[in-house]
């Protein structure tokens, strides 16, 4: 086994250790069926003809057919180099290029061209920037909202899947002020193995960021990836901790190893357990839950947002539903 990564750099000791375990064979239930409806076909042709780029097609997301049929798509901002390394993530770690201040405008134009109902914006951690990339994330939301303000079907809704910005108050305030319809920050795994899987993040800090977003009035969301060494009991505890922190929406998925350099798959969670976890999360009190082997954090994102809003409005005092909807 070569100790050189595909990008030519020397592999980290952790990556060398990971590479000693061959890529695991997927169970038969890890498969998708291509269902190409008319809206998907339109989107596919548009993306190709306009030279647009979305995470959906570039990452080979298994849910692209359903999401594009609903006119939903995900965009990656901030470049292709992350300043942090998570042991499950396929994005490379390294020194990012200089901030592209025109990127938010271009993303907004892509959203307009694709006539999206719902856009998820995710990106890399930018600890190299003085503001941690807060302006970039916020400005992308502002551009999408501004450029789609006159859309016949209504302004495109934006979900911001963001890093933790080290929980810096000024950086969080910048991001929150852009008022994305949903603020998502993924904890991804349970406390016991968190530091090993996500050494650049802190579990309690992530919970704090979710709480801050909820206190600001934003709809909040997170994700748990299963199969990296957690126990069933730890998943239940993490769900309770997320809900207590103010998380309203949750997605639960199976870890799929990007390459031999990444953390080995420790278990394949069977479909019935995902069903059980969905029921458990709903009993805990989450407004919306998506749970399944091929669910991703942006899967059916627009539907989850709508579930959160319906619950907020039904829980609002009489005459207060309008206030609840304006809060996001």
Swiss-Prot record:
Tell me which cofactor or cofactors this protein depends on: [4Fe-4S] cluster
**SMART domains this protein is in?**
Elp3
Give the catalysed reaction(s), semicolon-separated.
Answer: [[Fe-S] cluster scaffold protein carrying a second [4Fe-4S](2+) cluster] + N(6)-octanoyl-L-lysyl-[protein] + 2 oxidized [2Fe-2S]-[ferredoxin] + 2 S-adenosyl-L-methionine + 4 H(+) = [[Fe-S] cluster scaffold protein] + N(6)-[(R)-dihydrolipoyl]-L-lysyl-[protein] + 4 Fe(3+) + 2 hydrogen sulfide + 2 5'-deoxyadenosine + 2 L-methionine + 2 reduced [2Fe-2S]-[ferredoxin]
Query: Where mainly located?
Result: cytoplasm
Sorted alphabetically, which keywords does the UniProt record give? 4Fe-4S, Cytoplasm, Iron, Iron-sulfur, Metal-binding, S-adenosyl-L-methionine, Transferase
Q: Name one GO molecular function term.
A: lipoate synthase activity
Stored Pfam families? LIAS_N (PF16881), Radical_SAM (PF04055)
* The protein's Enzyme Commission number: 2.8.1.8
Q: Output the superkingdom of the source species.
A: Bacteria
- Binding of [4Fe-4S] cluster 2 occurs at 82, 86, 89
Note the Gene3D superfamilies from the entry: Aldolase class I
Entry binding sites for [4Fe-4S] cluster 1: 56, 61, 67, 298
Q: Record's Gene Ontology CC terms? A: cytoplasm
Q: Which PANTHER family match?
A: LIPOYL SYNTHASE, LIPOYL SYNTHASE, MITOCHONDRIAL
Can you say what this protein is called?
A: Lipoyl synthase
Gene that produces this protein: lipA
């Amino acid at each position: 086994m070569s100790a050189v990564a595909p990008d030519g750099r020397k592999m980290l000791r952790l990556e060398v250790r990971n590479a000693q375990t061959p890529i695991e064979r997927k169970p038969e239930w890890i498969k998708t069926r291509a269902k190409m409806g008319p809206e998907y076909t339109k989107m596919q042709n548009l993306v190709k003809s306009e030279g647009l780029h979305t995470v959906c097609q570039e990452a080979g997301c298994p849910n692209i057919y359903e999401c594009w049929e609903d006119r939903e798509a995900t965009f990656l901002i901030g470049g292709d180099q992350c300043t942090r390394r998570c042991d499950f993530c396929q994005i490379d770690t390294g020194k990012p290029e200089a901030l592209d201040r025109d990127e938010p405008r271009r993303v907004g134009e892509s959203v307009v061209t694709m006539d999206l109902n719902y856009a998820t914006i995710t990106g890399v951690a930018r600890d190299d920037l003085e503001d941690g990339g807060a302006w970039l994330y916020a400005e992308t939301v502002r551009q999408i909202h501004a450029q789609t303000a006159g859309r016949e079907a209504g302004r495109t809704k934006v979900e911001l899947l963001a890093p933790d910005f080290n929980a810096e108050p000024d950086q969080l305030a910048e991001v929150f002020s852009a008022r994305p319809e949903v603020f998502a920050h993924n904890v991804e795994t349970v406390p016991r193995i968190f530091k090993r899987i996500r050494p650049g993040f802190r579990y309690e800090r992530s919970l704090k960021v979710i709480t801050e977003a909820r206190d600001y009035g934003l709809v909040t969301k997170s994700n748990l990836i299963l199969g990296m060494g957690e126990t069933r009991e730890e998943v239940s505890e993490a769900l309770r901790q997320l809900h207590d922190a103010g998380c309203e929406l949750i997605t639960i998925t199976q870890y799929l190893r990007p390459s031999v350099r990444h953390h080995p798959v420790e278990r394949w969670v069977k479909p019935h357990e995902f069903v059980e976890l969905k029921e458990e999360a709903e009993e805990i009190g989450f407004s919306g839950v998506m749970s399944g082997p091929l669910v991703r954090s942006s899967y059916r994102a627009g539907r989850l947002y709508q579930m959160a809003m319906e619950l907020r409005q039904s829980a609002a005092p009489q005459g207060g539903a309008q206030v609840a909807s304006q809060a996001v």
